[in-house]
Amino acid sequence: MSIQPDLLKAVLQPLLSAGHNASAAGISDALASMMSVNADVHMCHPFGDIKGPSAWFKACFEPLLLAMPDLERRELVVVAGTTEAGQHWVGTCGNYMGKFVAPWMGIVPTGRLAYMRYHEFYRIEDGEVVEVQAIWDIPELMMQAQQWPMAPQLGDSLCTPSPMTQDGLRTQDDFVGQGAQTQAHVLTMLNDMCKHPSQGGPEVMNLSTYWHPRFNWYGPAGIGVGRGEQGFRDWHQIPFLRAMPDRALDPSGLTSHWVAQGNYVCETGWPNMR
């Protein structure tokens, strides 16, 4: 049974509101009010799996707030819906921002405004969050502190902006369509992309069919931003395929949860890439 997307988003409202002017008490109370005490939280390395809102706050948010006492959470896109399997998910992306004044996870503070992109997904049952799958772009913060230990990224560095259309935070009534056509478009695109290189040259991907000629690809830190089809290929896809030419949409042993609204599609899984 599907649930209206706006009702799903409302479950997250305590956190979204507390993030405007974050404090330890505000974030802690927000998580406690919207999450099951037994919620499974799957965080990126080095945090790993965490049980419950209190432990999540202690492991992740409390140290971040000590490093950035004026922390704020800036949502860019929030998408909600029910998957084909009947699960209810809310997907969010945005930037954590604040003045970086104290060390965090061994990263030396800059004393300046810093930002860290996040992608967080929340599974909801009976009006509360029962699972979280989240990635914080910690390398992005390392680069701002000039503490990146690996090779320079090929793409550009940029604090990810909101969509040009400025409609990533719309309510359900404002979205045009239910997203099914958009999701089908994305899935077809991914299938075509996986035809290269095993089934032919770059032309078999039909990239111009799916992408605007002036699109931006906002890769994670370590890869960076590319402009247009050529930028995507030069700074991400070609180096990626040289390293992992056998990547494919292989569902074996992996999970994938898709929801879409209007022109927006989000997908998560833990794990969902091999």
Task: Show where each model-derived region lies.
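C-terminal and inter-domain tail/linker signature
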Residues: 1-274
